[in-house]
Design a protein with these regions (language model features):
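Conserved glycine-rich Rossmann-like NAD(P)H-binding loop of the short-chain dehydrogenase/reductase
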Residues: 84-97
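N-terminal Rossmann NAD(P)H-binding glycine-rich loop of SDR-like oxidoreductase domains
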Residues: 55-84
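Mid/C-terminal beta-alpha module of Rossmann-like enzyme folds, strongest
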Residues: 292, 296-371
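NAD(P)-dependent short-chain dehydrogenase/reductase
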Residues: 191-197, 227-282, 286-297
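Phosphopantetheine-dependent thiolation modules in NRPS/PKS and related acyl-activating systems
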Residues: 1-50
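Conserved Rossmann-fold NAD(P)-dependent oxidoreductase catalytic core, especially the SDR/UDP-sugar
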Residues: 138-141, 149-150, 157, 161-214, ...
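NAD(P)H-binding glycine-rich loop region in Rossmannoid oxidoreductase-like domains
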Residues: 106, 110-161
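Conserved cofactor-binding/catalytic machinery of classical short-chain dehydrogenase/reductase
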Residues: 161-165, 221-222, 285
């Protein structure tokens, strides 16, 4: 067994066993993960303990991560339109090449800070970090690396350490933190058999000790850190899991989402290459999620019963429609196959259509990547 971590895309791009062996040799050595140790609540920094400040009744300041993502394109306009919100502080903003990503940060209420989720203080200076700890009223954490195949060790800095930094910022004034997680933190049989009664905490379902299924493992760790920060520091925590629908998708809802794929194909002039992919995706209209999140953010700043709650608060958003890879491929081929659009790998295609305003957000997916002979290579649930 090789106790190393490697970007899977690097391994799959190796054409020979010699090249694969070289990638293994170059991989970073990793240890078995002690999940209890890795998800301990951060302590409150001494530099922030002395800066506690009572908040007034003026317009709210909302801190947002993941502000150039697909969901943020729906959330930021909702927050800007709310008269109770005076300022939206977008942190850990990394430069993106396309204009659509930058344009959503140009609202009158938006202040942006360049940075990186993987950096200490999210790339903010000590003074900026302390200032926001006193200014911010509520935090919405949507930022994460969403690599489909990478190990937890590769995603840890961006997806887990960033949450600890937000706890540091929130703790002095007990600023509510709203965290976008995934239903993948629960085993499929637990989620599927619960009929709406899935456990609110995923604490009992630790991820693999080797860090495999890294994205889901990082979300599980994030939930646990926030749960424990609530217990030890009193930081209000709100966790959101987008999950598969429990009802059959209507023909109308499937038609709407398939037509949305067609619209995005026309805008990008590329088609998805689904070779080797099987499975399905569960989707929710982005506007619906954004409006519900906006209401929850405002509501959490007014709550007086947070200290009486026994645990972090969980909210589930059920998807409204499920479509299979075959559904997507067949529909697009029938309506746009004759136009000669260039095919691109399906994951890259999803990124392209998000960039041009795909109006749904991914609630969950179950996918299998097979080789050319139909043999199973990789299975993913998130």
């Amino acid at each position: 067994v090789f106790n190393v971590t490697i970007h899977l895309v690097d391994l799959l791009s190796s054409n020979t066993l010699v090249q694969m062996a070289r990638k293994v040799e170059e991989g970073a050595s990793v240890e078995v993960i002690d999940w209890d140790q890795k998800t301990k609540s951060p302590s409150m920094p001494i530099t922030l303990r002395q800066n506690q400040k009572k908040r007034g009744d003026g317009p709210l300041t909302v801190l947002v991560t993941g502000s150039t993502g697909n969901l943020a394109k729906r959330v930021l306009p909702v927050l800007e339109a709310n008269p109770l919100v005076g300022k939206i502080v977008c942190v850990a903003v990394r430069d993106k090449p396309n204009e659509a990503s930058r344009s959503i940060l140009r609202g009158d209420k938006i202040v942006q800070h360049a940075g990186d989720l993987s950096a200490p203080r999210l790339g903010l200076t000590t003074e900026q970090f302390q200032g926001l700890s006193n200014e911010v009223d509520v935090i919405l954490h949507m930022g994460a690396l969403r690599s489909f195949w990478d190990n937890y060790h590769i995603l840890r800095l961006s997806n887990v350490e960033s949450i600890k930094e937000l706890v540091h910022l929130a703790a002095p004034n007990r600023i509510p933190i709203h965290f976008m997680s995934t239903s993948g933190v629960l085993p499929r049989d637990v989620l599927g058999s619960a009929a709406g009664q899935a456990p609110s905490s995923a604490a009992a379902y630790e991820p693999p000790l080797d860090g495999s299924n890294g994205y889901v493992a990082s979300k599980w760790a994030g939930e646990r850190i926030l749960e424990r920060a609530f217990e030890s520091l009193g930081v209000p925590a709100y966790i959101y899991r987008l999950q598969p629908t429990r009802a059959l998708s209507s023909d109308t809802s499937k038609s709407w989402v398939l037509d949305e794929f067609v619209r995005c194909v026309d805008l990008t002039a590329v088609m998805p290459d689904c070779t080797g992919w099987e499975g399905h995706i569960d989707l929710i209209p982005g506007r619906e999620v954004a409006e519900r999140l906006g209401e929850a953010l405002i509501s959490s700043t007014r709550r007086t019963d947070v200290g009486e709650a026994a645990k972090a608060q969980l909210t589930r958003y059920d998807s409204t429609v499920t479509v299979s890879v075959d559904d997507i491929e067949t529909h697009l081929e029938e309506l746009r196959g004759m136009r000669g659009f260039d095919p691109v790998p399906v994951l890259k295609w999803m990124g392209r259509i998000k960039a041009v305003g795909f109006s749904y957000v991914l609630a969950s997916l179950e996918a299998m990547l097979t080789n050319g002979n139909g043999g199973e290579k990789l299975t993913m649930w998130r």
